[in-house]
Amino acid sequence: MKQVSKITICLLCVAMVLTGCRDKERSKADTANHQAAVSQSMKRISKVEKQGDMRQYDVADKQRITDFIPKGYKLFEKISGDLNKDGLEDCVLIIKATRKDGFVKNSFDKVVDRNRRGIIILFTEKDGYKLASKNYNCFSSENEEGGVYYAPELWVEERKGNLYLRYCHGRYGYWEYCFRYQGSDFMLIGYEATYNRGPLVLGKTSINFLTGVEYDDENINADKFDADSDDDPVADEVFKRTVVKLKKKPLIKLSEIEDFDELRFE
């Protein structure tokens, strides 16, 4: 009996040792799996946080621009270009008023947005933007009446460091203003216009406000066109030039122009 008891005790000890080893191995495996799960979870969290940070930067960048837009206006168009020749892309914002009384019926009995437009110019700097010039109401609405034709279309662009504001009126020609940053504002330094009948140029005007000289070119063959089409010229365009010396005046500031539609030069 004593011998049997000893054998039983030995077997119980062996079983306990084996069970302990299995539990230890299982514990190691569980720990490894838990650590792997935690690591994977941290990677997912890190990725989400990174994406969130990027979205935050995008929003912050947009906020730096829109912070310059006054209450009661919305962004109509954004144009980029180096306007102070420092190698950085500056920002031109065309804004539009959002007044409720600006919505009216046109001649076709259709409700259109006649709110006026303006311009904000921002210079790009290392830590954001700096206001260079602003004029909140100098442009008419894009939905003005165009008579038998559509309303003139405003084009804004940067060329060789200068700001160009061009009104295109299809077959009737265009007129364009050239501004250059000087001192603390954008100054009007040039003006061009063409007067067309379809492809036929009737006349051209070019003014250099720096030199105070105006050039008026008149097509002396303007009356020679195809009578059936009232458009196609039958003779080459030949221009007669008249040079006009303008009175010396201070350059016009972009920020001080009340209405481009009423701007006249003498």
Label every model-predicted segment.
Residues 18-20:
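C-terminal motif of bacterial Sec signal peptides marking the signal peptidase cleavage site
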Residues 73-78:
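Primarily EF-hand calcium-binding motifs
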